[in-house]
């Protein structure tokens, strides 16, 4: 069963259980996160070896993408650490993945949003925080991790910068255009209510046929007068109306 729990923080905080369908989230549905999966790779020299961390996150169940090697099939988040020795041999030393049935907290921020969840790594529970920010000039999300994964007492903090943290195009376009649309809708509704009320008052206790004829006549008169009204308004706006000048004119 899915549910949403709201808490007042910097933004709105939502708790979502079961597989995360982003379209059902009030916050996540506004962003492009359901269209992308993020992955990152970081290599560090750790003599006598070389250590590489692989990060992968596919937050929304709407987006389908193969899970990386060594990660569980039902993972929505996975971190894999791999060590390459100086003889060229490679070993996977750590795998930490979080299944889709984990609860996910979503917090909307001023410059994006943050998700947090908890997964089990061996006998320990690890808290993960992933922060999304928008970079609409990038085709894929860039992943960076803050702090060492081996610090078991601190949360795993991952930062994603890319298209996933950007608001949907329909959300951006709603502004002045949206207000104009609503104003037109309200104007039409108020006009319709006015015509119905005036028609009803005119016929009094007359028949339904009388009311319909009165309503049609008033509506027709209103529609036929609109072009002349619009022409008069445009004339006032463009021409500024007739100007008067005092004094005598030369003959």
From Swiss-Prot:
- The signal peptide here is 1-19
Any GO CC annotation of this UniProt entry: cytoplasmic vesicle membrane
Topological region Cytoplasmic? 197-251
Localization in the cell = Cytoplasmic vesicle membrane; Golgi apparatus membrane; Mitochondrion membrane; Preautophagosomal structure membrane
Topology in the lipid bilayer is annotated as:
Single-pass type I membrane protein; Single-pass membrane protein
Q: What is its main location?
A: membrane
Mind listing the UniProt keywords for this protein, alphabetically?
A: Autophagy, Cytoplasmic vesicle, Disulfide bond, Golgi apparatus, Membrane, Mitochondrion, Protein transport, Signal, Transmembrane, Transmembrane helix, Transport
Q: Which GO terms describe its biological process?
A: cytoplasm to vacuole targeting by the Cvt pathway; pexophagy; protein localization to phagophore assembly site; vesicle organization
User: Transmembrane residues, as ranges?
Assistant: 176-196
Q: Which InterPro entries match?
A: Autophagy-rel_prot_27, MRH_dom
MRH domain mapped to chain residues:
20-168
> Could you state a single Gene Ontology molecular function term?
phosphatidylinositol-3-phosphate binding
Question: Does Lipid metabolism show up as a keyword for this record?
Answer: no
Q: Name one Pfam family in it.
A: ATG27
Q: List the disulfide bonds.
A: 22-60, 71-78, 134-166
Q: Which residues lie on this side of the membrane: Lumenal?
A: 20-175
The domain of life is: Eukaryota
- Annotated family: Belongs to the ATG27 family.
Its biological purpose is as follows: Effector of VPS34 phosphatidylinositol 3-phosphate kinase signaling. Regulates the cytoplasm to vacuole transport (Cvt) vesicle formation. Plays a role in ATG protein retrieval from the pre-autophagosomal structure (PAS) and is especially required for autophagy-dependent cycling of ATG9.
- The protein's name: Autophagy-related protein 27
- Organism field: Eremothecium gossypii (strain ATCC 10895 / CBS 109.51 / FGSC 9923 / NRRL Y-1056)
């Amino acid at each position: 069963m899915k549910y949403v729990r709201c808490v007042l923080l910097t933004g709105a905080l939502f708790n979502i259980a079961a597989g995360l369908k982003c379209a059902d989230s009030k916050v996540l549905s506004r962003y492009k996160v359901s269209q992308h999966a993020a992955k990152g790779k970081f290599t560090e020299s750790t003599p006598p070896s070389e250590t590489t961390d692989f990060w992968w996150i596919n937050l929304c169940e709407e987006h389908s993408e193969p899970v990386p090697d060594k990660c569980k099939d039902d993972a929505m988040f996975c971190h894999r650490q791999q060590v390459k020795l100086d003889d060229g041999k490679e070993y996977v030393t750590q795998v930490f993945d979080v299944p889709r049935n984990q609860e996910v907290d979503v917090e909307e921020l001023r410059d994006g949003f943050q998700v947090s969840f908890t997964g089990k790594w061996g006998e320990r529970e690890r808290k993960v925080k992933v922060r999304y920010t928008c970079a609409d000039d990038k085709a894929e999300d860039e992943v960076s991790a803050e702090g060492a994964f081996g610090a078991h007492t601190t949360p795993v903090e991952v930062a994603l910068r890319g298209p996933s943290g950007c608001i949907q195009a329909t959300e951006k376009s709603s502004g002045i255009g949206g207000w104009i649309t609503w104003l037109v809708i309200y104007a039409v509704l108020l006009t319709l209510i006015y015509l119905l009320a005036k028609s009803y008052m005119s016929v009094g206790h007359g028949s339904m046929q009388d009311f319909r004829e009165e309503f049609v006549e008033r509506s027709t008169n209103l529609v036929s007068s609109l072009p002349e009204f619009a022409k008069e308004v445009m004339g006032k706006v463009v021409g500024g109306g007739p100007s008067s000048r005092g004094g005598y004119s030369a003959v």
